[in-house]
């Protein structure tokens, strides 16, 4: 919030205003000049809060402190709204190990940059009726990523693809490591195959 967006001190000129303090004080309905006098005596500012109210509402406060706190809230809100970047990497069921190594190398770089990585295995022909071959590839990838990233939920089938999202591991204090491992057991081949039916039905 800038000074151009609010009326302060001598710029406020109303016959009557409802004047309140920043800590809940109620000064009542007085002239804007009287309200300004109160603010000046306290070494504070008079800020117009609501011009449309009848009478208009003014608050006695430290405007610079108010502006700083407001700008801080806006910055924090923008950080929370920051979109997560997702990088997509396509694989095939017949991919060679050296090609997997190359693609995983890039995936790890993305994860280290705090990006999410979505691996998609292309299912060709009859493979689309049985995603086992695709899951086998994803399992190989998972073992190469497990020290740096966590799989998000289970793999899921999307038409001619079977995909799996990986996200950066949260940085936690050492005392929480044991609890984290207990709450997030590693995926294994059995779990993957059990989840295959769920993956086919999940959208």
UniProtKB/Swiss-Prot annotation:
Record-level GO BP terms: ribosome disassembly
Cited Pfam families: IF3_C, IF3_N
Provide the species name: Helicobacter pylori (strain ATCC 700392 / 26695)
Q: List the protein's name.
A: Translation initiation factor IF-3
Which cysteines are disulphide-bonded? none
Q: Which family does it belong to?
A: Belongs to the IF-3 family.
Q: Which UniProt keywords apply?
A: Cytoplasm, Initiation factor, Protein biosynthesis
Name a GO molecular-function annotation.
ribosome binding
Predominant location category: cytoplasm
What compartments host this protein?
Cytoplasm
Basic and acidic residues bias locations? 172-182
The gene coding this protein: infC
Share what the entry says about its subunit structure, partners included.
Answer: Monomer.
């Amino acid at each position: 919030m800038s000074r151009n967006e609010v009326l302060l001190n001598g710029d406020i000129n109303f016959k009557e205003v409802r004047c309140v303090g920043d800590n809940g004080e109620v000064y009542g309905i007085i002239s804007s000049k009287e309200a300004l006098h109160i603010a000046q005596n306290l070494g504070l500012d008079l800020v117009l809060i609501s011009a449309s109210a009848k009478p208009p509402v003014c608050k006695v406060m430290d405007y610079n402190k108010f502006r700083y706190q407001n700008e801080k809230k806006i910055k924090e809100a923008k950080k929370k709204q920051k979109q997560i970047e997702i990088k997509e990497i396509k694989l095939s069921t017949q991919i060679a190990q050296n090609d997997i190594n190359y693609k995983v190398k890039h995936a790890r770089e993305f994860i280290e940059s705090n990006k999410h990585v979505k691996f998609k295995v292309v299912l060709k022909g009859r493979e689309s009726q049985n995603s086992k071959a695709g899951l086998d590839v994803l399992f190989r990838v998972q073992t190469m990523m497990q020290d740096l990233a966590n799989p998000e939920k289970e793999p899921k089938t999307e038409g001619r693809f079977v995909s799996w999202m990986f996200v950066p591991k949260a940085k936690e204090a050492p005392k929480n490591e044991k609890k984290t491992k207990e709450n997030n057991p590693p995926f294994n081949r059995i779990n993957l195959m059990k989840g295959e039916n769920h993956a086919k039905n999940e959208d």
